[in-house]
Curated annotation (Swiss-Prot):
Gene for this chain: fbiD
Cleaved signal peptide residues: none
Further facts: The exact nature of the substrate is currently not known. This entry has been annotated based on its similarity to Actinobacteria.
Alphabetized InterPro entries for the sequence: CofC (IPR002835), Nucleotide-diphossugar_trans (IPR029044)
Taxonomic classification: Bacteria, Bacillati, Chloroflexota, Chloroflexia, Chloroflexales
EC number: 2.7.7.105
GO biological process terms on file: F420-0 metabolic process
Species of provenance: Roseiflexus castenholzii (strain DSM 13941 / HLO8)
Protein name in UniProt: Phosphoenolpyruvate guanylyltransferase
Length: 210
């Protein structure tokens, strides 16, 4: 089964507002772009047939183009509606993987692990959200991103009679939304672009993370 990935990206001027007391607007945009690049790098190394970045932000388009992703201009003001827009031309016999742009520790083998699961595969976020979602049948699926989306997506899959596989990946269970998340990212092993930037920001601002 072919796999099509969709990465939704907010307008960067609205990105990471909960980090505003720690990072200025330019730093937040820089971090958001670094995380997007990390996500697209991982997807480009996996066996995904196509990656679509849906956004209204031209800077996101530039990163998407650099990684060979398809650009979809977001015509909506709603995440779930945007996902439907990006998925409209995905073949009925393909699988769709939804990946947020702020999980910079994503690895190619994470993608293939989910792709190997029959039915619906979900990686939960630590706050009750959904950080990876794979569904094999877009025509019969309702996207429910938002508060408590993990439980809601599981219920939606079961309501339709689909098997649900919960794939817990600790390195993907945190969105980078708060200072604690930024510190956590900096402390994890690895040297992604977002990790290097997080360490630079925290060291510059006097945070001791080692």
């Amino acid at each position: 089964m072919d796999l099509y990935a969709i990465v939704p990206v907010k307008e960067l001027r609205h990105a990471k507002q909960r980090l505003a007391h720690a990072l200025d607007a330019h730093e937040r945009q820089e971090l958001s772009l670094a995380m997007l690049g990390d996500v697209l790098a991982a997807l480009s190394q996996s066996q995904v047939r196509r990656v679509t970045v849906i956004s209204r932000d031209t800077a996101a388009y530039q990163i998407a183009t650099a990684y060979g992703a398809v650009i979809a201009v977001d015509q909506t003001s709603d995440l779930n509606a945007a996902l439907y827009q990006a998925a409209v031309d995905v073949p009925d016999d393909a699988a769709i993987l939804i990946v947020p742009s702020d999980v910079p520790l994503l690895r190619a083998d994470d993608v293939m692990m989910l792709a190997a699961q029959p039915g619906v595969a979900i990686t939960p976020a630590h706050d009750g959200g959904t950080n990876l979602l794979l569904t094999p049948a877009i025509r019969g699926w309702t996207f429910l991103f938002g508060p408590d989306s993990f439980v809601r997506h599981c219920a939606e899959a079961r309501r339709r009679g689909w098997t649900v596989h919960v794939v817990r990946l600790p390195h993907l269970e945190r969105d980078i939304d708060e200072v604690d998340d930024l510190v956590w990212l900096a402390q994890q092993p690895g040297h992604t672009a977002a990790q290097r930037l997080a360490r630079e920001f925290l060291m510059r601002k006097g945070a001791r993370i080692w």
